[in-house]
Amino acid sequence: MSSIHPTAVIGSGATIGEDVQIGPYTVIDDDVVIGDRTVIAPHVYIADGARIGSECRIHSGAVLSTAPQDLKYAGEKTELYVGDRTVIRECVTLNRGTKASGKTVVGSDNLLMAYVHAGHDCVIGNHVVIANSVQFGGHCEVGDYVVVGGLAGIHQFVRIGRYAMVGGISRGALDVPPFVMAGGHNSFRYEGLNVIGLKRRGFTSEQISTIRDVYRVIFQSGLLLSNALEAVRRDFEQTPEVKEILGFFASGAHGRKFLKPFNS
């Protein structure tokens, strides 16, 4: 049975799952779905369009699924999706999508620490850790198992590949490919592989060595990027990791450039 504090304001059209806990003074609009066994702390606002999964933990001051901060937004119906078992800490703000994609997505098993903001149409994968006060502009894409350090500022449309780590207090408008560490106060730069993260996730020494060799060609050979990628296609066994790296570089959009070598 769900437990809803008498001071909470729940829209008559909201769908509340089994064994949900909702704290004092929380407000939930009509067009909202809350999954089973999710716990919502006091003083949370969940606006129309939110689709929250099961076993999430939403802490005080969080504001979810409010209108996108986009001058082109004209009130069209859009949504925010949050997967299962995601923890949303104090004062996190997640805007719903615009007509560009119709939705903002935050996956499952994520930790969004206090004061994180994800703008409209962002897509955040699974098993992602985003530290305090990280700010994502609209349309960002974050792969699975990414870690973003506190106070980082991520420009709109930036993509961060799987298993990457972005350093704290960094900011950038460049795409960050999978498996790497990136940082920099003016522009993201390549700072080596996320070796500790890869080992924790079960990557073998051979896999890590291959990934390192690929990025040496891409970032440290002195070749133009197009020539470096061709060398990787020609000279390396096309393992899943190599294919993922090449696929990431092949799928860039919006004229977005990739992070720079650390010595540039």
UniProtKB/Swiss-Prot annotation:
Name the record gives this protein: Acyl-[acyl-carrier-protein]--UDP-N-acetylglucosamine O-acyltransferase
Domain of life: Bacteria
HAMAP family (UniProt xref): LpxA (MF_00387)
Oligomer and partners: Homotrimer.
GO cellular component: cytoplasm; membrane
EC number: 2.3.1.129
Protein's organism: Chlorobaculum parvum (strain DSM 263 / NCIMB 8327)
Compartmental location: Cytoplasm
Catalytic activity: a (3R)-hydroxyacyl-[ACP] + UDP-N-acetyl-alpha-D-glucosamine = a UDP-3-O-[(3R)-3-hydroxyacyl]-N-acetyl-alpha-D-glucosamine + holo-[ACP]
Keywords on record: Acyltransferase, Cytoplasm, Lipid A biosynthesis, Lipid biosynthesis, Lipid metabolism, Repeat, Transferase
Example of a GO biological process term: lipid A biosynthetic process
Any one GO MF annotation of this record: acyl-[acyl-carrier-protein]-UDP-N-acetylglucosamine O-acyltransferase activity
NCBIfam families documented for this protein: lipid_A_lpxA (TIGR01852), PRK05289.1 (NF003657)
Biological role stated in the UniProt entry: Involved in the biosynthesis of lipid A, a phosphorylated glycolipid that anchors the lipopolysaccharide to the outer membrane of the cell.
Family assignment from sequence similarity: Belongs to the transferase hexapeptide repeat family. LpxA subfamily.
Enzyme class, first EC level, given as a word: transferase
Pathway in which the depicted protein is active: Glycolipid biosynthesis; lipid IV(A) biosynthesis; lipid IV(A) from (3R)-3-hydroxytetradecanoyl-[acyl-carrier-protein] and UDP-N-acetyl-alpha-D-glucosamine: step 1/6
